[in-house]
């Protein structure tokens, strides 16, 4: 449970609707879990990694960096075929020191407060379809302003989200991330094809980690642990050139809740 603003941000795409122009409209929503403050209600032209990363860069520059981001297991927030379910987007979050909190597959109630936000949007915005994307974005901006500034919440003691929310104390740097690992680690960069090279050995880890600096630490039986910032990705056996990934975050969440 979040105890302060920016402890947890929640993110999702609301279900799409068609504008009068025939354009598909699929809002990206980002919310501070503690204060209920809606950080973003944006209408990107596509739900791609690049579009969502651009929006998060804007949010981080404006509000700072949260401690945790909670999402479902869908693209571009996660990848079911990659180590730990990491996508390029969530690997970037990890490199920034943000912890990941994933809902269980097919359990939207795990992010229930965010789903209720989407119901409000469905009832109060989507029911009044605008002419085009620009007009619909303007309507979303007005709704977000009203929700944050003028809508009191019982859980906030009758206060509005804007009266509770404050920016993060963790600043965001626009400079490329330079991960530094501690004593006992060797740093290696994942190649564009997702492989890691070590003493003439090439081992595939994950394409989602392309360009990321990972830390290698000796483990038992001649194996090496592979870390991305604080996250243990798995182990590599360079004798067999094989990588064994850690259990996915979603599977681990399901196991713990069983």
Regions found by a protein language model. Name each.
Residues 23-25, 82-86, 116:
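Short, glycine/charged-enriched secondary-structure capping and boundary segments
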